[in-house]
Amino acid sequence: NSNDSTDWFDAKLKEMGKSLNDITRYAEADGPAYQELAKLAPDVIFAPYGNMSAEIYKKLSDIAPVVTAPKGVGMFEVSWQQVVEQAGKMLGTPSAATKLIDETTKQLKEATSKYSNLAGASFIAGYFDVEKKTLGAYTAKDSRPQTFTDWGMVEAPYVTEHSKEAQSVFLS
């Protein structure tokens, strides 16, 4: 939107009695803003998504303990359920996390049951790289299309056939 934000984010700020002037946002294009993060003196850094190289992890760990993706789960492969589980562990409330996952899953099933046309419908979770001028699709290994499969949809055959173990595939 015109605030370089989203309408829902702006609405939540307003609900909290805040404005964009009350918050600080950091660009991540060149990696984490380590010095700025350190100034905030966080108790923990919650970073379950993204490209967490050993170098980035070390620098962040020098600032605060870092919660990353679960062991064995690649970057951008973390499901929303795993994010909630990691948050529950971090906060010392694993049972609350489990309850939230169960309640949300139930609500999703109830909501999607109203739309029988979703079951079995194919989808492509795509992206456009402006700099490279390429069009691609995230695969089932990536967390971004998981919402669609949670709704009962299936990955488009083209993506499945051309992706193998990749997280994304170029479309042509």
Region annotations inferred by a language model:
Residues 1-36:
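A short, structured surface patch at a secondary-structure boundary
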Residues 3, 44, 50-53, 72-75, ...:
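Solvent-exposed loop/turn segments at secondary-structure junctions
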Residues 8, 32, 36, 55, ...:
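Extracytoplasmic/secreted proteins, especially bacterial periplasmic and envelope-associated proteins
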Residues 26-33, 162-172:
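Short helix-initiation/N-cap motifs at beta->coil->alpha
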Residues 26-28, 47, 69:
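Short beta-strand and adjacent tight-turn residues that come in two discontinuous sequence segments
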Residues 37, 41-47, 65, 172:
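Proline-aspartate-enriched helix->loop->beta-strand connector
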Residues 63-131:
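Extracytoplasmic substrate-binding proteins
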Residues 137-169:
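Alpha-helical, coiled-coil/dimerization segments enriched in small aliphatic residues
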